[in-house]
């Protein structure tokens, strides 16, 4: 329920400000979610929800880059660094609290925790 509320909030913000999202370059949003392992269904559901939200506001300037955290803090940091190398400054996730422990190393990224 908590994840659903946060996703709905993000969607609501995107829908209310579509003019601010229209830009000459792509807006890149990273996703740190479990796409393998025991929690892969949660991750796949979040990816699908975010993509539906982007389609709902009909903005082709937004690109979503999902990365698999495998539900592991070390893998989460690795995935976040990969997104950072792609010059992605906004990341939604990670899903699990335990995966937050190393992310303070990445000061130039804005995380929206689920």
Where are these regions (language model features)?
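Extracytosolic ligand-binding ectodomains
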Residues: 2-14, 21-114
């Amino acid at each position: 329920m908590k994840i659903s509320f946060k996703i709905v909030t993000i969607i609501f913000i995107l829908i209310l400000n579509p003019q601010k999202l229209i830009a000459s370059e792509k807006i890149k949003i990273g996703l740190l979610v479990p796409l393998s392992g025991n929690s892969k269904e949660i991750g796949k559901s979040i990816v699908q929800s975010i993509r539906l939200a982007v389609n709902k506001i009909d903005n082709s300037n937004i690109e979503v880059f999902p990365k698999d955290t495998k539900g592991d803090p070390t893998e989460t940091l690795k995935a976040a660094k990969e997104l950072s190398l792609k010059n992605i400054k906004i990341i939604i996730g990670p899903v699990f609290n335990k995966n937050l422990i190393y992310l303070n190393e990445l000061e130039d990224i804005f995380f929206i925790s689920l």
